[in-house]
Amino acid sequence: MAHAELATEQMLLKEIGRTERNRRQIRGWLAAVLFALFALVLVGGATRLTESGLSITEWKPVHGVIPPLSAEEWEEEFRLYQRIPQYEQINKGMTVDEFKTIFWWEWAHRLLARGIGVIFALPLFFFWVTGRIERRLRLPLLGILALGGFQGFIGWWMVSSGLAERTAVSQYRLATHLTIACLIFAACMWIYRGLCPHSDDAHPTKRSQGMAGAIAIMSLFQIYLGAIVAGLDAGLSYNTWPLMDGAIVPGGLFVQQPAWINLFENPKTVQFVHRLGAYLLFALALWHMIASLRAAPETTHARRSVLLFALVTVQAAIGITTLLLQVPIGWGVLHQGGALVVLGFAIAHWRGFVGTYPRDTAIEMRD
């Protein structure tokens, strides 16, 4: 009897060790995906700020990997760009060499997006067929893969909005594109954090988990609002802080009819709402930190709340600086990257309240 119990215990320990090894491999893979997604969002921000997003006027998911390689091919690509309103109304007289500059930004963005698809799909297939992915994670990971494929379509849908009548992409489609990218990033972070070891600290308060979730959701919504700001160049409508043209609430916020359309199409209103969102996020993070420190100052959850508030504060400072400097490219990209850092940490903090995924003892290893 004792021998059987010992054998069972040894088998269990072996299974636990195998599970931990598998989880380390999955975490390493997801960390690489998260890093690549972060880089993609930064390149996407630079592509937008340099007004390069419409330089490639065709969607070629496979052949588009290869850029123009000869003078004739560059001339043909440039001729395609010369047909769209952005060239006619903004960049008339641009040379081929100047066109190459904006082309490379958009090409790099698309190439990196394709690369992330490979980085995600191939390891997913390998980990799946070798039994390294726990059953509870299979459907979520497939969902992320499907959302990533859909994001490619959304990207072209966004670009196509600026090829016929507009000189820039639709702010609605830009916001959709960026928000889906951030959803993919958040989902990967949620799973990654769930595979990491967690502390056994008690929650600082019963409301702490809900507050952490509210901060994460508000961070994502603020990114959506920021994308609307970017799509309308609303960051240039008021370049003063804390007042807007000398007022807390500027005039002309609801001049368009119906009134609700101002929230999406009036640059002044859009910037005002984005500012309000930033103040709300700052207040939520501050409240969460104070409540956590008062309830349980020595816990990991409380320490994370301090770091989260610090990140929100730094991001607010970057946003204000970007505004005052009238949105230079470097600061604009930094602000977009900072938003993703805040979102990622907010998601990890929220997931920390849930704890590690329970071990799936039914994992099957196959050579």
From Swiss-Prot:
State the reactions this protein catalyses.
Fe(II)-heme o + 2 A + H2O = Fe(II)-heme a + 2 AH2
What's the superkingdom here? Bacteria
Q: How does it sit in the membrane?
A: Multi-pass membrane protein
Recorded GO molecular functions are: metal ion binding; oxidoreductase activity, acting on NAD(P)H, heme protein as acceptor
Its family remark reads: Belongs to the COX15/CtaA family. Type 2 subfamily.
Cofactor(s) the protein requires to work: heme b
Give the record's keywords alphabetically. Answer: Cell membrane, Heme biosynthesis, Iron, Membrane, Metal-binding, Oxidoreductase, Transmembrane, Transmembrane helix
Tell whether Metal-binding is among the UniProt keywords: yes
Subcellular location(s): the record lists:
Cell membrane
This entry carries the following GO cellular component terms, namely: plasma membrane
Associated pathway: Porphyrin-containing compound metabolism; heme A biosynthesis; heme A from heme O: step 1/1
Give the EC class as a word. oxidoreductase
State which residue ranges cross the membrane. 26-46, 111-131, 139-159, 174-194, 212-232, 276-296, 305-325, 327-347
Q: Which InterPro entries match?
A: COX15/CtaA_fam (IPR003780), HemeA_Synthase_type2 (IPR023754)
Q: EC number(s) of the enzyme?
A: 1.17.99.9
On subunit structure and binding partners, the annotation says: Interacts with CtaB.
Instruction: Report the protein name in the record.
Output: Heme A synthase
Which residues are heme-binding?
H274, H335
The role this protein plays is: Catalyzes the conversion of heme O to heme A by two successive hydroxylations of the methyl group at C8. The first hydroxylation forms heme I, the second hydroxylation results in an unstable dihydroxymethyl group, which spontaneously dehydrates, resulting in the formyl group of heme A.
Gene Ontology biological process terms, A to Z: heme A biosynthetic process
Originating species: Rhizobium meliloti (strain 1021) (Ensifer meliloti)
Where is it chiefly localized? membrane
